[in-house]
Each structure stands twice: as C-alpha cells, then as structure tokens.
Amino acid sequence: MMYKAVFSDFNGTLLTSQHTISPRTVVVIKRLTANGIPFVPISARSPLGILPYWKQLETNNVLVAFSGALILNQNLEPIYSVQIEPKDILEINTVLAEHPLLGVNYYTNNDCHARDVENKWVIYERSVTKIEIHPFDEVATRSPHKIQIIGEAEEIIEIEVLLKEKFPHLSICRSHANFLEVMHKSATKGSAVRFLEDYFGVQTNEVIAFGDNFNDLDMLEHVGLGVAMGNAPNEIKQAANVVTATNNEDGLALILEEKFPE
C-alpha cells in the first residue's frame, strides 16, 4: 500500500517522556515532508503548545489542536473550528463545582483560563506546555474549544462517567489517566482526519495514524493503518492494526521507516 498522509498524536506518541522529539524521528518526518507526504500533528494541546514542535519539524503543513476542535493551515489560519455552547459551559461548571480538587482549564484559540491558577494540576500543566494560564474570566470562557479537567485517576474516571451521563451530546474522553477533555461533539481526532482527507485529496486507506490513548481511538479505527504505541493501554492496542515500540523507543520512526523506505 502506498500511504499518502500521516497523522500523529503528541504526548506519549510523537514526544518522548521528556517532551522531546527524538533525532531519529525528526529525520524521518523531514524526509516525508520533502517527498510531499503530509505529516500532521493532531493533539489535545492548544496551538501554542504545538507550535514549537511544528517549527522544529519544518512540516509547513496544517496542525490540529484541541483533539480536532481547531484546525489551522500552514499560515496558522483556522480552516475548521467548533466550540462548546455557552449553555453547556454553565451546566458543566455547576457539576464541576462539586469537585473542588480538580484542575479545570478553558481553552479558546491560543488563550487558556483556569478555574484556579494555584491548583496543583494547573501548575503542572503550565510546566509541561509552557503556555500562560490566566485567571478565570466568565466572558473569555463562555464558549471555549475545550475544557481540560485534571486530577487523580480515580476522580477523573468518576467525573467522566458523570459528564457523559449528563452531556451525551458532547465529546468527552480521557487523553491520559489524569486528563479528561470536554469538547463539541464534532471535535474528535477521527473527525479531523476525515476533514483533512478531503483537504489533502487522499483516501482513507492511504492514511496512517499513530496514537497511545483513548482520545486517539476513533482516529486509529478510521484510517487505513492505525498504529498503537507500545505504551498504550491494552484497549487501544487491541483496536489498532499494528502495535509498535514505545514513545521512548522510537516507535513512530520504526513504522515510518518501514512504510516509507529511502
């Protein structure tokens, strides 16, 4: 099979545990780009959290933020955007008020506001993504692209079940044991890939996607070759076509070198 586009999750997939891209991975991605194969980062992060790596890879292509809620072209202009309705935000905030220990971040374009900027989980998120997180602002958070909820794994599972029950019309998915993402129903990685297949003029069976967690599932199931990382949960591995090495063992580069030999 001749593959014509590649999509990759970020944390736990493209990035090592040290939040870097390995030299081997950089080399193979730059080779793909030089040969006209789009390599698209598709992340739960905001555009600002993706951009340093996007520039490092020199892909000069689109990027997908907020797990599909926002897609920017090579000029960093939006070509797709879906946001949570204000009425849903009000109701979600009421539910989350009963869980004061959780970190809650509201992302809109490149802005992030936190329910409590001193929350330990919010401080951790700021240390990883290096983005500025502002104090809560009712106007700025009335219709975000994404709500990020961070906490202990047990409480994250509890709040996931609760929110899915109350808001079946929203996209609610864990991106990590400690992270829950809430977005518009049309904001999934699978939906973003479908949109970009049309954008690039490629067929589904000509697409490879890499992922390591539950918010990657619909993307991995959709594409021609869904690749789960060796560090992915068993449910993700079972849903993928192929399981590669971990993100710390150049798992992504191994598959790309195999499918796109020099």
Swiss-Prot record:
EC number: 3.1.3.-
Top-level taxon of origin: Bacteria
Keyword Metal-binding: yes
Gene3D superfamilies in the record: 3.30.1240.10, HAD superfamily/HAD-like (3.40.50.1000)
Active-site residues (renumbered): D9
Binding-site positions, phosphate: S43, A44, K189, N215
GO molecular function: magnesium ion binding; phosphatase activity
Keywords: Hydrolase, Magnesium, Metal-binding
Record: residues binding Mg(2+): D9, N11, D212
Cofactor names: Mg(2+)
Cytoplasm as UniProt keyword: no
One Pfam family it belongs to: Hydrolase_3
One GO CC annotation: cytosol
Top EC category: hydrolase
Assigned protein family: Belongs to the HAD-like hydrolase superfamily. Cof family.
The protein's name: Putative phosphatase HI_0003
Naturally occurring in which organism (per UniProt): Haemophilus influenzae (strain ATCC 51907 / DSM 11121 / KW20 / Rd)
Upper taxonomic lineage: Bacteria, Pseudomonadati, Pseudomonadota, Gammaproteobacteria, Pasteurellales
